[in-house]
Amino acid sequence: LTVDKIVVNISSEAIESNLYEISVPIKDTQVSKKDIETAFMNAEEQNVSDDKVIIETMPLGFSIDGVRSIEDPVGMYGKKLDINISVITCKRSIVQNLNNVIENAHAKISKIIISPFASAIATLSSDEANLGTILIDMGAGTTSYSVFSDGIFKYAGVSPIGGNYIT
């Protein structure tokens, strides 16, 4: 058996979770995938720097002309599309070091997932995610947390304080 692609997770206080509300004028009054892509690019541009890498960009919710709670706005009509977006970033050096280790094992990273998100997906029921949950995962050296509401991931982070510092 040869493993050539690996999904890795990062648990580091260098993880940042930023929330944005991006407004995009709707061309031709009907929302297209291009309008949504433009909003994502605008959110990602606010996170571009030499020392950070974008791990994940996730939509949290859509609204058209002030009407909220739209699941999929493509094909709907309006003048202004607002998208709430979560952008997860990490220090570039951490991702480069992970990539180096994986490449030295003759494999490639297929996806990077942040630990707080992975913990939540592995442990939360759909009811818990829908009702709203803050999942706290305390390890020896770090404590990670993720926030879910209405079944949607909202925010995450990692604190450099773990069980070793408390007990």
PLM regions and their residue ranges:
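Residue-level detector of high-confidence beta-strand sites
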Residues: 156-158
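Short beta-strand scaffold segments in enzyme catalytic cores
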Residues: 143-147
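Catalytic P-loop NTP-binding/switch module of NTPases
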Residues: 166-167
